[in-house]
């Protein structure tokens, strides 16, 4: 954070390119993006051992040890953090000069998305590995959304509907914790030989909404449940902070 702002872009580029090189060099030849043979899993197995890793992924009928966003993925995660820091600096500077941040963020966001989609051909977008192309894609989308929201809320001073997002934003730690608790408990709870989450999808959401829309409906419902808990805290003025 003490680094001059003008160097952050180069630091970000260095981190993302280095992660790409590490993944390619230390993953198994031809399988460096495979769930069983990637460098992220290899390092986690070396550092923590198989018994201390998450066993939520099934390969050939067997649950394997693999932590999504493992220790090595901290590198690109730092880059994600730096992108957020860069946006905050940009918004601050634009506010001081009384300028709109919309066009700048739309331009940068679009550029990052284009780079991500091109890079995806060589280093695929993958959330579980937090790949460099995934970082750029998410940053690009976020830049555009932040630009639009900043323009709508700060420049146009439109506040209708903001409370819905404030409920989650002011208690983001609680929202994350609730989502993890629900996901873990649904995964443990068995109904007719299926996990609770699988049963809900296949018996409620998929029959009503179809395959893809059912998945979307499940995700939206999950978010709304978490929002409901956060809303209770919002009404009580209870906020969890670090």
Map each language-model feature to its residues:
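Alpha-helical transmembrane segments and their immediate juxtamembrane cytosolic regions
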Residues: 1-242
């Amino acid at each position: 954070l003490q680094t001059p702002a003008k160097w952050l872009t180069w630091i970000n580029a260095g981190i993302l390119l280095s992660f790409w090189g590490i993944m390619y060099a230390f993953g198994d030849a031809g399988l460096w993006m495979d769930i069983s043979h990637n460098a992220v899993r290899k390092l986690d197995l070396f550092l923590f051992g198989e018994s201390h890793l998450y066993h939520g992924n099934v390969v050939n009928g067997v649950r394997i040890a693999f932590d999504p966003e493992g220790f090595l993925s901290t590198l690109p995660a730092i880059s994600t953090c730096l992108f957020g820091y860069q946006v905050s600096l940009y918004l601050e500077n634009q506010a001081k000069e009384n300028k709109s941040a919309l066009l700048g963020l739309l331009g940068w966001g679009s550029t990052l998305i284009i780079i991500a989609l091109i890079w995806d051909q060589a280093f695929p977008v993958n959330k579980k590995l937090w790949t460099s192309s995934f970082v750029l894609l998410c940053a690009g989308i976020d830049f555009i959304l932040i630009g639009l929201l900043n323009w709508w809320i700060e420049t146009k001073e439109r506040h209708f509907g903001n409370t819905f997002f404030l409920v989650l934003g002011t208690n983001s730690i609680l929202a994350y914790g609730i989502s993890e608790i629900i996901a873990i408990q649904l995964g443990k709870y068995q109904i007719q030989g299926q996990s609770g989450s699988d049963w809900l999808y296949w018996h409620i959401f998929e029959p009503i909404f179809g395959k893809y829309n059912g998945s979307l409906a499940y995700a939206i419902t999950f978010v709304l449940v978490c929002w409901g808990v956060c809303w209770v805290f919002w009404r009580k003025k209870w906020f969890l902070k670090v």
